[in-house]
Amino acid sequence: MAPRLQLEKAAWRWAETVRPEEVSQEHIETAYRIWLEPCIRGVCRRNCRGNPNCLVGIGEHIWLGEIDENSFHSIDDPNCERRKKNSFVGLTNLGATCYVNTFLQVWFLNLELRQALYLCPSTCSDYTKGDGIHGGKDYEPQTICEHLQYLFALLQNSNRRYIDPSGFVKALGLDTGQQQDAQEFSKLFMSLLEDTLSKQKNPDVRNVVQQQFCGEYAYVTVCNQCGRESKLVSKFYELELNIQGHKQLTDCISEFLKEERLEGDNRYFCENCQSKQNATRKIRLLSLPCTLNLQLMRFVFDRQTGHKKKLNAYIGFSESLDMEPYVEHKGGSFVYELSAVLIHRGVSAYSGHYIAHVKDPQSGEWYKFNDEDIEKMEGKKLQLGIEEDLEPSKSQTRKPKCGKGTHCSRNAYMLVYRLQAQEKNHTMVQVPAFLQELVDRDNSKFEEWCVEMAEMRKQSVDKGKAKHEEVKELYQRLPAGAEPYEFVSLEWLQKWLDESTPTKPIDNNACLCSHDKLHPDKISIMKRISEYAANIFYSRYGGGPRLTVKALCKDCVVERCRVLRLKNQLNEDYKAVNNLLKSTMKGDGFWVGKSSLRSWRQLALEQLDEQDGEAEQSNGKINGSTFNKDESKEEKKEEEEELNFNEDILCPHGELSISENERRLVSQEAWSKLQQYFPKAPEFPSYRECCSQCKILEREGEENEALHKMIANEQKTSLPNLFQDKNRPCLSNWPEDTDALYIVSHFFLDEWRKFVRKPARSAPVSSIGNAALLCPHGGLMFTFPSLTKEDSKLCQPLERREGGWPTAAHNNIALIWPSEWQMIQKLFVVDKVIKITRIEVGDVNPSQTQYISEPSLCPDCREGLLCQQQRDLREYTQATIYVHKVVDNKKVMKDSAPELNVSSSETEEDKEEAKPDGEKDPDFNQSNGSTKRQKTSQQGYVAYQKQVIRRSTRHRKVRGEKALLVSANQTLKELKIQIMHAFSVAPFDQNLSIDGKILNDDCATLGTLGVIPESVILLKADEPIADYAAMDDVMQVCMPEEGFKGTGLLGH
């Protein structure tokens, strides 16, 4: 099919030869493209918008073939949420609770612990016996033991693929959005559980934590002098093994039990010798628990950075661990089998993900527990190889080779071993009846949900099949051919064929013209379909209005024909007018604006389009929608403000403008052609005189300009020094022969000088408004010390407050000589006279001077103004401050911030060989200054820092300085984050100071720290001394670690 523009031209080509009154039905059907050939499927690739008979590519392709039933719904198979046979149940990750989930799975697969918890008395039994379970109430565990009971029962017999542990997490008071130290959680929870179970009467329940996890070791100290041995016996629930510098688990255990020498200042006080003696100390394992927890200390405190870091070194461990060599008492079996490996994915101590590899004690098969997902390992061997490749480490340490029965990991942080004798002696743990009843109820809810989801899927499939049959039937009957037809919106047809959206009633209102018929311009978004198909659509979906053959609008077609013919005539007239303008004009002509002549064709086209639009709006509707008359008036008003044809030569009085450069004469013939398109345009024959009022105003303007020049010259001659800003008085160097000075507003001076420089462009200044310098009581608002400057034009209306910060930013007064004041009173009207008189006090020291003002100072108003300005400096938003980064400039930091100590490891040679500022830091590559200038900047910056106090309204940036937008209520920590983005310096590497004061309270606001707009803050960055893998977690690093403070683990 031809392109859309070609179809548009073809539909209206007949209008070139047919007059509006001769338009027939055939012309109307041609304009509406009734008889265009329909497109064929497979030939036409996409829908032809210019052809109402093209029904290809409207979304039918998805319905005309075989359709998979699953495409009729968006509901997942509920059986995907069902627990797989012979598998375990997962736990939902509530945000950052993966570390909790891993320990819950490890403890669940400890059958002895599970059995003991099932034996605990519970309020659940009362709930099942009463009306709780039958009354439809949800069971809410009351204690930690009850939460574990219910969780373990669900993990054992639930039909769900995963369960929600939010009740257990909420009972502990854990923050689900904050990742915590998994090893600390394990210790605290075991302590809490032991304390809770210690109150039980059943010894199997009361002592289960000690029996399963508790061992004993002794700190043994031997005096080298007398050989006396002292023991301190302690219980342990896990062994914390240092992995730094080791490659095998056995090496870590050996170091844990290694003998330590106590010598020198660390000597041991021997009670037998009654003095300090050299001694040895070591740990002896006295007894080992059934379940041996080995904590690998992967997360350690880094003294250099002041934060935790993760050790990503590989540690080798075996599936079988013989602890007999490490135990003092050799009786019994001490061979352990590996039962769980807890993994931390990630290179940082502040982020990552926790998973667990746990062995089923009954089948001996290994499973990977990853929150909701449970994966069974192939065979009966532990597989960590894939796990170790998930997180690439920055260190390129190669993974060591592992022998049979051994494994290596750089992410394992806890190993759980079970005593081999107990590992093989397992019986099935039964869920108590009262807990099983709760599990059955939860399973019943799950089954009901599965049935409900399956029914919803079935309903969606049935609806989809019915829609499929409807589309296959109706699409074949859509083409109208020579049969009776109707028009339907293309958008509605596409939505009817779109399975993802419900079909709404047909709405053709957007396609109507002002005559409530089908608009010819809207044919591109309509489709012509058979009357048979239209009847079915309207009977099933409703809507309207129905657009039959009677909806073809003859009035719109006739009007469009008229406009098209006028446009064709306009092209011919445009060429004729251009030719007439080039030829020599004979006889009288007409004045036409040059701007109108350049754009008359465009104006005529716009006028024709406006007429076409007004025809559409004639019945109060636009495209079927009600037309707002108020909006129409506003649009017309805006259009009227634009100049119409030949209005560019009208003067303000509606007559011919006196500016001859903006118009030209055209011939009578050219004007006649132009007047056909603009009959209401202003007409000015060549003999018409220009506007008489404008001529008078022009003469008066010339006279006023001459008068202004004369006044300006007179005032300049009378006040030459004031105009040129020379020989100005100042209070600090008061002339001996002058007793009084006067004050005027600096605003008056600016306006007066502007007039004197350009009297033709500015109005004369006739008065001086000094009242603006006074308070409402008529008193002065500034003190005399603030006027004692090097130059009176730099005077500020307020003095500095204590601390050196200026309290005013604008200079608004000037001092006047008495002789100048006499002349000013003659030339201008002065509303308020402000006079300062000097009086010398004392006969011995005449240099002591007092100043008396008329009017006098108003202390109350001045104090109020000072307080207001102080408040404004402390309460600002989106103000600009400047941060200056100091690099290799130790002297500057010492001078401006003595509290900052430079690293003591720097030698004198390093100081001498320090490169210029710009050679090491990219933030300094902002200036092309010479090396000589860089060398002098060290001394100059101290002076610059002092000059910051005398800040002007315009700050001049220097090298290594960046502007930041801040607010007074913003904390220092938030400012450090901004500085980090601007300078790529981590907050913990930033040393900030302002006027020699160190900024170190991260929680304080900038307002309380004395940071005001236009302040300059010095930034000294610490040199990087380690690989900051935790740079991505800098926001979390900067926050103080609170651990499990405020949770149930610490008895909140």
Swiss-Prot record:
Keyword set, alphabetical order: Acetylation, Cell projection, Cytoplasm, Hydrolase, Nucleus, Phosphoprotein, Protease, Repeat, Thiol protease, Ubl conjugation pathway
Start and end residues of each stretch annotated as Disordered: 609-639, 896-940
Positions bearing N6-acetyllysine: K973
Domain DUSP: 459-553, 568-691, 710-841
Stretches with biased composition (Basic and acidic residues): 912-923
Residue spans of biased composition, Polar residues class: 616-627, 924-940
One term of GO molecular function: cysteine-type endopeptidase activity
Annotated function: Deubiquitinase that recognizes and hydrolyzes the peptide bond at the C-terminal Gly of ubiquitin. Involved in the processing of polyubiquitin precursors as well as that of ubiquitinated proteins. Plays a role in the regulation of NF-kappa-B activation by TNF receptor superfamily via its interactions with RELA and TRAF2. May also play a regulatory role at postsynaptic sites. Plays an important role in cell cycle progression by deubiquitinating Aurora B/AURKB and thereby extending its stability.
Name of the featured protein: Ubiquitin carboxyl-terminal hydrolase 48
Native source species: Mus musculus (Mouse)
Organism taxonomic ancestry: Eukaryota, Metazoa, Chordata, Craniata, Vertebrata
Record gene name: Usp48
